A protein has these predicted regions:
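Conserved catalytic alpha/beta core of Sir2/sirtuin-type deacylases, generalized to analogous enzyme cores
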Residues: 3-160
Length: 160
């Protein structure tokens, strides 16, 4: 997270983090511009009325919890395999990938679509794509540069 903090300070409002993680730790660590591509475990969505809201109670007092709006059943506000990415997150991430100059791929297998396609979107929009990973993965062909190793050791090489 130290790299993220330094990069965000250096780049200011030009820094955007797109995460596939659903745990909310990037926001808790201080990232101010985060797209939670696969949603957040700290949000709920009603299966009946679609109401969405933050819910940080842990553990939940009742499973499944009732919807405060209609009494229906709530589910975690995350994307399960086979579900569609929320339109807002997908559009925001694609817009950012098309507009960026530098797109970093960090610690992902690149096997989960459509998130894995964002590197190609960035590259086709003339961004430099750099992959930081332990081994080559599903987006390595899109990367202009592949840096092998643990992200905690290799990412700080970008920020002096």
């Amino acid at each position: 997270m130290l790299f993220r903090s330094e990069a965000e300070q250096l780049l200011g409002d030009r820094f955007l983090l797109i995460t596939q993680n659903v745990d909310g730790l990037h926001a808790r660590a201080g990232s101010s511009t985060v797209i939670e591509y696969h949603g957040s475990i700290w949000r709920t969505r009603c299966l009946d009325c679609g109401d969405e809201r933050e819910d940080r109670r842990a553990p939940l007092p009742q499973l499944p919890p009732p919807c405060p709006a209609c009494g229906g059943r709530l589910r975690p506000g995350v994307v399960w395999f086979g579900e569609t990415i929320p339109a807002g997150a997908a559009a925001d991430a694609e817009t950012a990938a098309r507009a960026c100059d530098l797109f970093l791929v960090v610690g992902t297998s690149g096997a989960v679509w459509p998130a894995a396609g964002l590197a190609r979107v960035a590259r086709e929009s003339d961004a430099q794509v750099i992959e930081f990973n332990l081994e080559r993965g599903g987006v390595s062909d899109e990367a202009h540069l592949f840096i092998a190793g643990d992200a905690a050791a290799t990412l700080p090489m970008l920020v002096p």
